[in-house]
From Swiss-Prot:
Signal peptide: none annotated. It comes from the Bacteria. Pathway: Cofactor biosynthesis; phylloquinone biosynthesis; Quinol/quinone metabolism; 1,4-dihydroxy-2-naphthoate biosynthesis; 1,4-dihydroxy-2-naphthoate from chorismate: step 7/7. Its EC number is 3.1.2.28. This is 1,4-dihydroxy-2-naphthoyl-CoA hydrolase. The active site is at residue 12. GO terms for molecular function: 1,4-dihydroxy-2-naphthoyl-CoA thioesterase activity; fatty acyl-CoA hydrolase activity. The lineage of its organism: Bacteria, Bacillati, Cyanobacteriota, Cyanophyceae, Acaryochloridales. Belongs to the 4-hydroxybenzoyl-CoA thioesterase family. DHNA-CoA hydrolase subfamily. Catalyzes the hydrolysis of 1,4-dihydroxy-2-naphthoyl-CoA (DHNA-CoA) to 1,4-dihydroxy-2-naphthoate (DHNA), a reaction involved in phylloquinone (vitamin K1) biosynthesis. Keywords: Hydrolase. InterPro entries: 4-hydroxybenzoyl-CoA_TE (IPR050563), DHNA_CoA_hydrolase (IPR022829), HotDog_dom_sf (IPR029069). It is an enzyme of class 3 (hydrolase). It catalyses: 1,4-dihydroxy-2-naphthoyl-CoA + H2O = 1,4-dihydroxy-2-naphthoate + CoA + H(+). It comes from Acaryochloris marina (strain MBIC 11017).
Amino acid sequence: MYTRTVRLQDTDAAGVVYFTSALDICHEAFEDSLMGAGIDIRTFFSNPDTATPIIHADIDFLKPSFCGDQLTLQLSTHQLAEDEFEVRYNITAVNKGERLIAKATIRHVCINPINRQRQPLPKELVTWIQRWSLAMS
């Protein structure tokens, strides 16, 4: 579980969390879970042989979130193919009685960064996916 305080920079002119900021916060939770599994994210994200770009992202807002809100993100992973996975996020506001305020899905594909061709997920990522695959089941 990842915890994050909504900052002013995360909000739009209406004072609520901007959709791209919410997706950024989801990516922070992704990075945090990789580190929690013992993956060195500096090495992981700068690997010259493997990249995992985002190919799809969506988010549904169920309730607004504002500057100062304490958010928790619970994630679960799903391997879709030998070269593709997605991460699903449930976002709750702690200061609002643990109310579910948003759900997001971010899908990644594994590629060779030189030729941009799909390739199988690295073993450490498959292990991470298996670890988190039952988190929200």
